[in-house]
């Protein structure tokens, strides 16, 4: 290794992170992938070792095999919760995907997902296509992704008023008092696959007394980061900051979007001006349940047995745990399930790329759900809903939180 190469390696922040792994194996106890496929490469320990071998030249060439290994991760963060060294494996995997993508190129699928969701035209076209397929009763065209309309009765509240269409920050306990001008951030998946749930979110926010605007926004950047398009994710972050800065608060009903928006300061840390703007914005980001709970919203009660699945980004990323449960306890006959925070196996496009593995992970989740006897399974993340929706039927509905707590 040349002196120049040695210096580059020694100054590599990612390598410094990888060097903290002592291969204790704590991650193997909580990794959803390892639980259904007991291979060391499935764990954080295995993937971090491969990444270190590549960066230090022990594994001189990566190529498609190494890319596949780095992509075989749900980015759920379960390993980081139990890691004695507090290694953020998800961050390491995202960094490696970007580096390998720059060197070896990205697959057509990953480029299509990243570029497509960043395109308003593509999202509009996709929304229209999905709506048409549903209207014509062609479920195969929508991939079985969208749960059936809820049978939960409405309580007679009027519909929404006309709407205008124009490293996570530590926020601590927050008050919703004084928040007037609220922006509802419509995530790509909510807009594409769950527009009725998105409308229910807005209706609920209005019932809680908020003035709600739906500004034109771009993708939050999570799909781009996950697929190695870091620079595109940075560009989207800047566009969204510019669009959302005027608002008192920004609320989203997608846990991944909320977590991504809060992480903009980290994403733009090397640009002082944008980092300052990102930090100011991050302090104004709320998840739907977080804001409604802080505002004291009282949902109508329905005689339904309901259980709740914690999305990884909302629970582990933002620490939102009690708010959705408090709302559901008021809105239903709530039942807590075992391992509610266990990843469902969806993780964006992971279930599409690894359907057999995702199916095994989902089966474990379904076992815990069915054990509660719940009629409705609730989540606050569209990616989770797309995965969990596959277990709907046999007396079980899968719904977004907003569809259960809306007026």
Residue ranges and their predicted role:
Residues 13-14, 47, 66, 75, ...:
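N-terminal alpha-helical segment
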Residues 15-34, 67-87, 341:
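Cysteine-centered iron-sulfur cluster-binding motifs in ferredoxin-type domains/subunits
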Residues 1-7, 34-65, 86-114, 395-404:
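Non-heme iron-sulfur electron-transfer modules
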Residues 2, 24-28, 312, 347:
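Cysteine-cluster motifs in flexible loop/terminal segments that predominantly coordinate metals
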Residues 10, 89-407:
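Iron-sulfur cluster-binding electron-transfer modules in prokaryotic oxidoreductases
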Residues 26-29, 40-43, 211-214:
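N-terminal glycine-rich anion-binding loops that anchor highly charged ligand groups
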Residues 1-19:
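Generic start-of-chain signal for non-secretory N-termini
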């Amino acid at each position: 290794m040349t002196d120049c190469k040695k210096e580059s390696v020694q100054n590599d922040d990612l390598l410094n992170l990888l060097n903290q792994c002592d291969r204790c194996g704590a991650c193997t106890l909580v990794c959803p992938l390892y639980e259904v496929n007991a291979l060391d490469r499935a764990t954080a320990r295995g993937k971090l070792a491969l990444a270190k071998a590549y960066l230090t030249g022990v594994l001189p060439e990566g190529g498609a095999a190494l890319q596949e290994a780095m992509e075989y991760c749900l980015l759920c963060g379960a390993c980081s919760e139990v890691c004695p060294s507090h290694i953020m494996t998800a961050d390491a995997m995202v960094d490696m995907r970007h580096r390998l993508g720059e060197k070896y190129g990205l697959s057509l699928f990953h480029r299509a997902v990243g570029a497509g969701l960043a395109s308003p035209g593509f999202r509009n076209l996709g929304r229209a296509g999905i709506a048409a397929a549903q209207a014509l009763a062609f479920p195969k065209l929508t991939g079985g992704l969208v749960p059936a309309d809820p049978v939960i009765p409405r309580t007679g509240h009027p519909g929404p008023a006309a709407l205008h269409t124009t490293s996570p920050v530590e926020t601590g306990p927050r008050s919703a008092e004084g928040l007037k001008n609220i922006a509802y951030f419509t995530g790509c998946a909510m807009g594409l696959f769950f527009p009725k749930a998105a409308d229910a979110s807005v209706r609920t926010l209005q019932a809680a007394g908020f003035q709600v605007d739906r500004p034109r926004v771009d993708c939050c950047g999570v799909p781009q980061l996950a697929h190695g398009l870091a620079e595109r994710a940075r560009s989207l972050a800047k566009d969204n900051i510019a669009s959302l800065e005027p608002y008192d608060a920004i609320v989203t009903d997608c846990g991944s979007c909320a977590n991504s928006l809060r992480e903009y300061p980290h994403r733009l840390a090397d640009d002082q001006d944008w980092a300052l703007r990102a930090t100011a914005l991050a302090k104004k980001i709320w998840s739907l349940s977080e804001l409604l709970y802080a505002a004291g919203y009282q949902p109508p009660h329905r005689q339904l047995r309901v259980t709740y699945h914690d999305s990884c980004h909302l629970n582990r990323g933002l620490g939102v745990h009690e708010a959705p449960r408090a709302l559901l306890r008021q809105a239903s006959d709530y039942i807590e399930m075992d391992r509610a925070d266990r990843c469902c196996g969806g993780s964006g496009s992971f279930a599409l790329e690894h359907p057999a593995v995702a199916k095994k992970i989902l089966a474990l989740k379904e076992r815990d759900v069915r054990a509660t006897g719940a009629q409705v399974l609730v989540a606050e993340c569209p990616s989770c809903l797309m995965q969990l929706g596959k277990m709907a039927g046999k007396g079980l509905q899968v719904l977004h939180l907003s569809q259960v707590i809306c007026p």
